[in-house]
Amino acid sequence: MRIDQSIINEIKDKTDILDLVSEYVKLEKRGRNYIGLCPFHDEKTPSFTVSEDKQICHCFGCKKGGNVFQFTQEIKDISFVEAVKELGDRVNVAVDIEATQSNSNVQIASDDLQMIEMHELIQEFYYYALTKTVEGEQALTYLQERGFTDALIKERGIGFAPDSSHFCHDFLQKKGYDIELAYEAGLLSRNEENFSYYDRFRNRIMFPLKNAQGRIVGYSGRTYTGQEPKYLNSPETPIFQKRKLLYNLDKARKSIRKLDEIVLLEGFMDVIKSDTAGLKNVVATMGTQLSDEHITFIRKLTSNITLMFDGDFAGSEATLKTGQHLLQQGLNVFVIQLPSGMDPDEYIGKYGNDAFTAFVKNDKKSFAHYKVSILKDEIAHNDLSYERYLKELSHDISLMKSSILQQKALNDVAPFFNVSPEQLANEIQFNQAPANYYPEDEYGGYIEPEPIGMAQFDNLSRQEKAERAFLKHLMRDKDTFLNYYESVDKDNFTNQHFKYVFEVLHDFYAENDQYNISDAVQYVNSNELRETLISLEQYSLNDEPYENEIDDYVNVINENGQETIESLNHKLREATRIGDVELQKYYLQQIVAKNKERM
């Protein structure tokens, strides 16, 4: 497959890397650049840097990064062609892929993508079955009676799976999809006795489940006739894994970043109703506990998480367990306590959207405040529990990262123990870091290294200084490169990465007139070389080289080659001494070739 270079350039020019990365990483301005937690490996202290000026990103921990295409390839685990297509769709640039297409009606790049295509194609027919067929009328009425407008149904892509064992099966087969792959995607079930396939979802209202990029990867089928189970979800598949999926994250991401808060609900139905009521930063897990993968992803967007679970005993227990775990992970945890026996959907149905949004805004407690209010009766009447929970709450408050929030929690919690905030503070070890949290350094987190200046440059070895400075000057402009390219033998570089960078610059200037790091990284396909390019970019040398400066670097680099010739001469003399004619011929040929390269 090949994409015209002009299309690639247009997409790159229209895609701002800061906007792109911000969809996945919570970034903070630090000097000239932005920093955040790396999306490619788990970390507690930010080491991922984005340069808006240079349009590149780079992790100083795992070394991954690059321009907008390489970031997209890495974050979505897709090919370069797929990344170009994805970003092209994002900026409304049509991507014409020059390739010989197969005769199949289904053009795909991987099994995973084909599975997603199946889900998205069948969604259109589920929606049609719900809104345009007689068989779907009862399901549609059921939704409408529960406040689902036509606009909301369309927005959420809700549909209806007919009461047929082969509706989905026959449709996908006619479209040319592999039935075994449809089974692996979770759309079909299989009779293990005769290995026949049939629809997994029948006579159910179908709610699409999307990944963080907004692609449909699964379904939740809800009964409307009382059959069990109430909800039938897609099974675990290569594209649908509950421990990684947060419902509504694709829609809520921007609001989460803007509000610097994520609100976690128990179910996707609560999310739909809460979002409709005006609460836009809401997500839910798919019937599973909040996983480490969930927490890692949340961390990249915000450090503030609010739990709003059902107002029953199970909801309270889940809030205490989840909140404790989140607090241990270094997040700021808050709780919205719904009235007894109610969930968000029921609250909205009873009091209306405005009352719900006001309640969410005004009834938010810190996790410590919520916890002590739940345990207040036991604290008041059980002296053993009093001591236990005093220590627990003291520790919980110590885990809070903000001193202001700590003081607020002290004021809220102390009255439940009939002590002053000062007395409660005495129980707290403020210098105790959470068990699973790495404290920030003395500057409050990762400090972006400054570009290497002259002082650091002087500390390098003579050879390394020459090689790095020489390449840095070649990066300034094409004329400098052309003037000096023939002056140096690439094999004289002591650093193999520099040798390859030298070749990269040759390829780059063959197609470009002006050096740009964002474009240059597209010419390398390894993290090590990308790291070398970015490292060279950080060198801060004189604006203009002094007279003969570059020539001096050339001489130093070529001295390494001369040393190689001297070594060959020594070996030639030794071969002559011992009378090895074959070795003499070999070393003589090497010396002649080496001298020709230097002419």
Curated annotation (Swiss-Prot):
Q: Which PROSITE patterns match?
A: TOPRIM (PS50880)
Keyword annotations from UniProtKB, A to Z = DNA replication, DNA-binding, DNA-directed RNA polymerase, Magnesium, Metal-binding, Nucleotidyltransferase, Primosome, Transcription, Transferase, Zinc, Zinc-finger
- Cofactor(s) demanded: Zn(2+); Mg(2+)
Q: Which Gene3D superfamilies match?
A: 3.40.1360.10, DNA primase, catalytic core, N-terminal domain, DNAb Helicase, Chain A, DnaG, RNA polymerase domain, helical bundle, Zinc finger, CHC2-type domain
Give the reactions, separated by semicolons, that this protein catalyses.
Answer: ssDNA + n NTP = ssDNA/pppN(pN)n-1 hybrid + (n-1) diphosphate
The record's listing under InterPro entries reads:
DNA_heli_DnaB-like_N_sf, DNA_helicase_DnaB-like_N, DNA_helicase_N/primase_C, DNA_primase_core_N_sf, DNA_primase_DnaG, DNA_primase_Znf_CHC2, DnaG_bac, DnaG_cat_HB
The GO terms describing molecular function are:
ATP binding; DNA binding; DNA helicase activity; DNA-directed RNA polymerase activity; zinc ion binding
Note on cofactor: Binds 1 zinc ion per monomer.
Question: Where's the Toprim domain?
Answer: 260-341
The biological processes this protein is annotated with in GO are:
DNA replication, synthesis of primer
Record's superkingdom? Answer: Bacteria
The family classification in the record reads:
Belongs to the DnaG primase family.
Q: How does it assemble?
A: Monomer. Interacts with DnaB.
Q: Which HAMAP family match?
A: DNA_primase_DnaG
The job of this chain, per UniProt, is described as:
RNA polymerase that catalyzes the synthesis of short RNA molecules used as primers for DNA polymerase during DNA replication.
Q: What is this protein called?
A: DNA primase
Say which species the protein is native to: Staphylococcus aureus (strain MRSA252)
